[in-house]
């Protein structure tokens, strides 16, 4: 019973630390609300949406789509940019593009939006939740390296989960609240364990790593 009480207290403390870290990361200004789980449209966005509706331009060929893609390329310095209906569909397409299929496992951070897990399920893969760190709220790569070293082996060039016997084919990180993951450690992990990488940067637009 004492052991159970200890673990409950420990988990509660961890949960409180996570919440505290999130609140600090938001860095709210006085009287400024930061919307997280509800839509928020300012006057400019409402005006642009009204223009689209009035001009009957609300499809993939809408006149703002190309402008949006060009601005994304400019901001991110990416060679290509393709707009999708939402972030979930973008993750789904990314998994298909790198050849993820049924029975593959995808590593995703435990603190996450449901889109990551859903995208894995759409292609028949299994989301494999991994630890995060309090500093960035992203993947704890130190713990991940220890975990993979202990619980996986290589077979036919793939990192194989010893317990499930399924190949771990990729890692899908998320830059939570705009805090970039430690990409230096990420590169070491994907190289050592032969993983493909997808970055969910929906919350990281405008953030840069070093």
Model-derived features: positions:
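Structural motif
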Residues: 76, 209-210
């Amino acid at each position: 019973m004492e052991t159970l009480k200890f673990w409950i207290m420990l988990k509660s403390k961890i949960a409180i630390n996570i919440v505290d870290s999130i609140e600090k990361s938001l860095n709210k200004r006085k009287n400024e609300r930061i919307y997280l789980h509800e839509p928020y449209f300012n006057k400019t966005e409402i005006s642009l949406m009204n223009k689209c509706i009035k001009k009957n331009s609300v499809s993939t060929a809408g006149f703002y789509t190309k402008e949006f893609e060009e601005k994304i390329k400019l901001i991110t310095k990416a060679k290509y940019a393709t707009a999708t209906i939402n972030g979930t569909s973008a993750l789904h397409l990314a998994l298909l593009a790198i050849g993820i299929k049924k029975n593959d496992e995808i590593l995703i951070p435990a603190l996450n939006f449901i889109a990551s897990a859903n995208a894995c399920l759409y292609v028949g893969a299994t989301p494999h939740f991994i630890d995060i760190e309090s500093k960035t709220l992203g993947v704890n790569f130190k713990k991940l390296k220890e975990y993979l070293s202990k619980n996986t082996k290589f077979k036919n060039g793939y990192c194989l989960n010893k317990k499930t016997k399924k190949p771990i084919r990729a890692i899908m990180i998320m830059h939570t609240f705009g805090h970039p993951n430690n990409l230096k450690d990420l590169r070491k992990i994907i190289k050592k364990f032969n993983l493909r990488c997808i970055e969910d940067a929906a919350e990281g637009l405008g953030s840069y790593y070093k």
